[in-house]
Curated annotation (Swiss-Prot):
Belongs to the dihydroorotate dehydrogenase family. Type 2 subfamily. InterPro entries: Aldolase_TIM (IPR013785), DHO_dehydrogenase (IPR050074), Dihydroorotate_DH_1_2 (IPR012135), Dihydroorotate_DH_2 (IPR005719), Dihydroorotate_DH_cat (IPR005720), Dihydroorotate_DH_CS (IPR001295). It comes from the Bacteria. This is Dihydroorotate dehydrogenase (quinone).
Amino acid sequence: MLNALYPLFRPALFSMDAEDAHHFTLNNLLRAHRMGLGSCIGNRIAEDPHTVMGVRFPNPVGLAAGLDKDGAYIDGLAALGFGFIEVGTVTPRAQPGNPRPRMFRLPQADALINRMGFNNGGVDAFVANVRASRWKAEGGVLGLNIGKNADTPIERANDDYLYCLERVYPHASYVTVNISSPNTKNLRQLQGASELDSLLSSLKDAQQRLADQHKRYVPLALKIAPDLDADQIGNIGDALVRHKIDGVIATNTTISREAVKGLPHAEEAGGLSGRPVFEASTRVVRALRGVVGDAVPVIGVGGIFGGADARAKIEAGASLVQLYSGLIYRGPALVRECAAALRG
C-alpha cells in the first residue's frame, strides 16, 4: 500500500524542512509497525540469497547508513523488504552534530546535500537500541557503522574506532568503518596510505581478539569516498587486500558540485548524494574491483534510482547494493524494483 501512496505523500513531505521530514517519516514508519500494520506498509520480497563476507543476505538490496543514525527505527525500516540494514554512524560519545539547517534537497537533480556531522546519542545508547530490535533478534542482517567524535584529534582517531568496535562487535552482522564523511574535519585524511595502514592494522588485531572472545567472527568493511583518483583507489585497494579486510563500501557522498552548479542550495557545505553521484561512485566500484579482484567484495552505493542503476553497480563489480537518497525520492517501491532487477 505504501508503495502506491508514497508519490501522493511526497509533496507534503517535501514542503517540510528536510530533517523534520526525515524524522516524521521514520517515526510514523515505526509507529505503523508497532500497531501491527507491517503488511500495509511493507514489501514482501522473494528470497534471493547472496553470501558475501561470509554472511548470508536474504536479498542483495540494503539500506545505507545515515538514515537511522541511532538504530532506533530498525524494525520499522525492516518492513520495507531490505535484505540488510546498516545503521549509524555512531561515535563513542554522544554529539549534536553541526548546527541546523544541515540537510538540503535539490529536487531538480534528484539530490541531497547534508552536513549532519555524525549527530548521534553515543555508542552505549546505540547498542541498547540494537539489542531491542526484534528484527535483529529474528536473524535480520544488520551492519553497524562506526566513526570518530568530532573533538577527537585525528592523531587519536584509531582509539575512537577501537572503542566503538569493542562495543558493537557482539551485536553486528558486520561492522563498517566510516573514514569518508566530508562532514567531520580531517576525517578523510584516514584514507591516506600511512594513516590507513595504521587504522586497518589496529582494527584487524582487535577483530581477531574479539572473535576469540565472543567465539564469532564479525566481518569488517571500510566505507570510502567517491572523490578519489586512480592512485588513491589503488593504494586503498592494496591496503584492503594486505590487511585482509572483509569488504568495502563504495561510496560515501561527494564534495564535488559540478553536476548541480547553479541550482538552489548547490553551494551549501556538506556531502552531495543522489543521482549526481552515480557515475563517480560506479567508477570507484569498477576501479576497486580491478585492484582487489575477488579478494574483497564491494558493496555499491550512490545514485541508485531504479533497477537499471542497481544492475549497473553489480555489472561494475559490486556484490550487493545499498539505497539512501533514491529511497527519499522514489519511496519504498525502489526496494522492490531493485530486488527484482537483481534476482537470478
